[in-house]
Amino acid sequence: MRPSQRSADAMRVVRLTRSYTKHAEGSVLVEFGDTKVICTASVEETVPSFLKGKGQGWVTAEYGMLPRSTGSRMRRESAAGKQSGRTQEIQRLIGRSLRAVTDLAKLGERQIVIDCDVIQADGGTRTASITGAYVALADAIRGLIDAGKLSATPLRDQVAAVSVGVYKGQPVLDLDYLEDSDCETDMNVVMTGSGRFVEVQGTAEGEPFSEEEMAAMLGLARKGIAELLAHQRQALNV
């Protein structure tokens, strides 16, 4: 039995609250159970130097955790003077996931920066960040269309992410912290609305996993992501 008493194929309660902050062009509070992340999208009328004059835009992301988002206080990475390898890996994953569903040529020479700030962590912060970041990005793009700066959306598809794993010998969906810290296998899956994979990150923490277990985990991920895509559409009223 899972610590949360959920069935193996059950997601935590998911909420997407749009327009959560006042200033950003797009903002969302995403909740996967007790994991809570604020995702904001900021439009900048400039592009990185490597894209100047090329007629296309860029979508990138930054990720961070508040010092007391976890059980004991963490030192701010800005105070330490450098980002951890984990932080860099996660923010690159978020950026890759969003660019996978964005036609950068249609975005024009502008950049949209997504900031994902974890205010409470209980497992799945990167997958919650990707899922919420898409909604924040979509809202920022709607604003550009409404302002007449874009004639059509550059978004080609939705994108969402979920964790799966093997916990006490059973493949399970959407691991919370207790499961994540005690699982035999941990996997993060990022998929588009059309059912294509952006990324699959899987690691055996102890006993190696079988091909059958991998297939079961991917099946659970498809189910969970289908639910997340529906949550996104409902939040965006599409």
Swiss-Prot record:
Keywords per UniProt: Nucleotidyltransferase, RNA-binding, rRNA processing, Transferase, tRNA processing, tRNA-binding
Enzyme Commission code(s) on record: 2.7.7.56
This protein's record includes keyword Transmembrane: no
SUPFAM superfamilies named among the record's database cross-references: Ribonuclease PH domain 2-like, Ribosomal protein S5 domain 2-like
Molecular function terms from GO: 3'-5'-RNA exonuclease activity; tRNA binding; tRNA nucleotidyltransferase activity
Taxonomy, superkingdom: Bacteria
GO biological process: rRNA catabolic process; rRNA processing; tRNA processing
Catalyzed reactions per annotation: tRNA(n+1) + phosphate = tRNA(n) + a ribonucleoside 5'-diphosphate
Stretches that traverse the bilayer: none
Residues that, per the record, bind phosphate: R86, G124, T125, R126
Root EC class: transferase
Pfam entry (one): RNase_PH_C
InterPro entries assigned to the protein according to its UniProt record, in alphabetical order: ExoRNase_PH_dom1, ExoRNase_PH_dom2, ExoRNase_PH_dom2_sf, PNPase/RNase_PH_dom_sf, Ribosomal_Su5_D2-typ_SF, RNase_PH, RNase_PH_bac-type, RNase_PH_CS
Keyword Glycoprotein among UniProt keywords: no
Function: Phosphorolytic 3'-5' exoribonuclease that plays an important role in tRNA 3'-end maturation. Removes nucleotide residues following the 3'-CCA terminus of tRNAs; can also add nucleotides to the ends of RNA molecules by using nucleoside diphosphates as substrates, but this may not be physiologically important. Probably plays a role in initiation of 16S rRNA degradation (leading to ribosome degradation) during starvation.
Family that this chain belongs to: Belongs to the RNase PH family.
Subunit (UniProt): Homohexameric ring arranged as a trimer of dimers.
Descriptive protein name: Ribonuclease PH
Organism of provenance: Chromobacterium violaceum (strain ATCC 12472 / DSM 30191 / JCM 1249 / CCUG 213 / NBRC 12614 / NCIMB 9131 / NCTC 9757 / MK)
Lineage of the organism: Bacteria, Pseudomonadati, Pseudomonadota, Betaproteobacteria, Neisseriales
Chain's gene name: rph
